């Protein structure tokens, strides 16, 4: 069974699969190979992708976009993020999203998008899909990776590997290339995150030497730069502040994104938003010409922010920019001319443009899926952990055990002991990050080692092992060195979803899938009902005088019943609607029977007349023939 590759992006998502030795991105039900990572809620249904995006202007508060920026993050870290929807703090301190009175974890929102990707693949392949490789930004920490894996689980997928986006892109770029050893840089500027990875490719071995990035830098920030400029200009011109007008902000967001895209190919673009607001003097319109030069000026600091991670990645890899053989551009934002120019200036070479920046990550994930399934051989992928892993030691200092850019999977052990006489439990706090003080890094969890035999301080020898798997996810174990027995460890995660929460969300997803199927059936039935009413009324107007009044009245009553049932938007009324439609279909057949009956009678009459005429004609001919014979006989 095929293993699909999914690029779960901030702005757009993509799914790919290996077919006949080649990986290809799959078109969704709307005919596009990328799907907006947008989820919207109405009183009656949930929308994903393009349908959600199309209604965003009129339903801004209930339309969720860029939720990837919240996944695996604490509320305190993201409370200042600009969004049209409400971000709240969950019980465990994580950032969740509140819509129509209900709270959703970012993993759930991601799962809705993954379900769409799963359905897209299943429609293309013609069978169920269970296994997937999902990509994440290289600079995602453990909590963000685990939350992404949870999203896959909620969506009904067995996520067999989490792979870094730049690494996936390198895999798609370098597979089947016969070149000798190459050192490449993957510059990945997407909708919400930025990553840069330095890789060495040789004889089918893809080895990541170093990675760096910024998980809060991407196309969303470019959009906001334009949005702020437009709203500030509008306020100066009219005195009206649009920041608190959700519908206006959504319209400006869409216009800003469109302008950003157009300015990649044009030197200027017009932004026109009529009736964006009003005051006592009447309606107000937002109309402005945005040049590429002005746009580049607005986002120059954002583009410049990508350079420092590039410098750090090169330093960690131990090479200089002039030693890079190829620079591969990934992510939709790398179409911006100023970005291309900045990359060229920094690396001193023209970037490689032979890959589709929107699809290459998903294609790489599909290739990795085939490698894990054993379908693609002689390819080895060696990735690294993007952040250091360590513990809090005396004075709140962060002591790394596994340094950043260590090849994964990896394992390292450290022996700990007690700080006081007779101590029978020790709490160890595990952090991930690069700051010197533990509190400034990401707390992954704390370990309570209980049941330690009472002894003088410093005597117990407890070996704690930190293990980072191929997904970049951290695992911890511990044992008492004196006895060799494993000790019980209670891990109290600082956040994330519990197993019970994940199972609840899986059940909700399954239930929602059933509801979605019922709604789909309901909508199809309503369409059929409306078409039946229209065609029956048309036939009744044209041929109603050809049937008995009792039949006509019965058909009119059936039409009225269907029309009344169509006015009910409750999905649970699908059975009632089905009965009404079936009844109308049955009684309307009387109209058809009458029409065809009349047609047959007319046809029969015409046939009889024709036959009689033929007989008379035959007699005339015979008579003439006989007369001719008589003449010939004379």
Swiss-Prot record:
Induction: By stress conditions e.g. heat shock.
Domain of life the protein comes from: Bacteria
Keyword match Lipid metabolism: no
Comp. bias (Low complexity): 600-613
One GO molecular-function entry: unfolded protein binding
Signal peptide: none
Annotated spans, Disordered: 597-634
Function field: Acts as a chaperone.
Protein name: Chaperone protein DnaK
Lineage: Bacteria, Pseudomonadati, Pseudomonadota, Alphaproteobacteria, Rickettsiales
Encoding gene per record: dnaK
């Amino acid at each position: 069974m095929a293993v699909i590759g999914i690029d779960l992006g901030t702005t757009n998502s993509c799914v790919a699969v290996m077919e006949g030795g080649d990986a290809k991105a799959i078109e969704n039900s709307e005919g596009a190979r990328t799907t907006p990572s947008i989820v919207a809620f109405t009183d009656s249904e949930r929308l994903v992708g393009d349908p959600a995006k199309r209604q965003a202007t009129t339903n801004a508060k209930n339309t969720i976009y860029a939720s990837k920026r919240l996944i695996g993050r604490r509320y305190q870290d993201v409370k200042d993020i600009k969004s049209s929807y409400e971000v709240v703090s969950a019980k465990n301190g994580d950032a969740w999203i509140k819509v129509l009175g209900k709270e959703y974890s970012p993993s759930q929102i991601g799962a809705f998008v993954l379900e769409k990707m799963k359905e897209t693949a299943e429609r293309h392949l013609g069978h169920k899909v269970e296994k997937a490789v999902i990509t994440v930004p290289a600079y995602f920490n453990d909590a963000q990776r685990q939350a992404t894996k949870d999203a896959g689980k909620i969506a009904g997928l067995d996520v067999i590997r989490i792979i870094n986006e730049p690494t996936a892109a390198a895999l798609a770029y370098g597979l089947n290339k016969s070149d000798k050893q190459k050192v490449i840089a993957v510059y990945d500027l997407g909708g919400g995150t930025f990553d840069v990875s330095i890789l060495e490719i040789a004889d089918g071995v893809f080895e990541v030497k170093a990675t760096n990035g910024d998980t809060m830098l991407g196309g969303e920030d470019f959009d906001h730069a334009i949005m702020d400029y437009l709203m500030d200009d509008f306020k100066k011109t009219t005195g009206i502040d649009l920041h608190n007008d959700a519908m206006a902000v959504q319209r400006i967001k869409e216009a800003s994104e469109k302008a950003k895209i157009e300015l990649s190919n044009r030197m200027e673009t017009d932004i026109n938003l009529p009736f964006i607001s009003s005051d006592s003097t009447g309606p107000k319109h937002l109309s402005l010409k945005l040049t590429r030069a002005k746009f580049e000026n607005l986002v120059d600091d954002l583009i410049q922010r990508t350079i420092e991670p590039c410098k750090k990645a090169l330093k960690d890899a131990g090479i200089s920019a002039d030693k890079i053989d190829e620079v591969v551009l990934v992510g939709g934002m790398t179409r911006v001319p100023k970005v291309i120019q900045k990359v060229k200036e920094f690396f001193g070479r023209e970037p490689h443009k032979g890959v589709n920046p929107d699809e290459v990550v998903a294609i790489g994930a599909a290739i990795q899926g085939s490698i894990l399934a054993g379908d693609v051989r002689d390819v080895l992928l060696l990735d690294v952990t993007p952040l250091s892993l360590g513990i809090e030691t005396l004075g709140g200092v962060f002591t790394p055990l596994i340094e950043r850019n260590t090849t994964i999977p990896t394992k390292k052990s450290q022996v700990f002991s007690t700080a006081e006489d007779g101590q029978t439990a020790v709490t160890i706090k595990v952090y991930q990050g690069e700051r010197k003080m533990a509190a400034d890094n990401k707390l992954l969890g704390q370990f309570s080692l209980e049941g330690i035999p009472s002894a003088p301080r410093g005597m117990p020898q407890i070996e704690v092992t930190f293990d980072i798997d191929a997904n970049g996810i951290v695992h911890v174990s511990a044992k008492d060195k004196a006895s060799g027995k494993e000790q019980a460890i209670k891990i109290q995660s600082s956040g994330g979803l519990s197993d019970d929460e994940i199972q609840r969300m899986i059940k909700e997803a399954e239930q929602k899938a059933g509801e979605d199927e019922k709604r789909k059936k309901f909508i199809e039935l309503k369409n059929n009902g409306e078409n039946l009413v229209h065609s029956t009324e048309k036939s009744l107007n044209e041929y109603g005088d050809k049937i008995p009044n009792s039949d006509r009245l019965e058909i009119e009553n059936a039409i009225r019943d269907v029309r009344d049932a169509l006015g009910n938007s409750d999905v649970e009324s699908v059975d009632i609607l089905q009965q009404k439609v079936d009844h109308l279909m049955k009684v309307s057949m009387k109209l058809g029977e009458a029409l065809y009956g009349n047609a047959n009678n007319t046809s029969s009459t015409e046939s009889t007349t024709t036959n009689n005429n033929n007989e008379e004609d035959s007699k005339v001919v015979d008579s003439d023939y006989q007369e001719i014979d008589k003449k010939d006989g004379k």
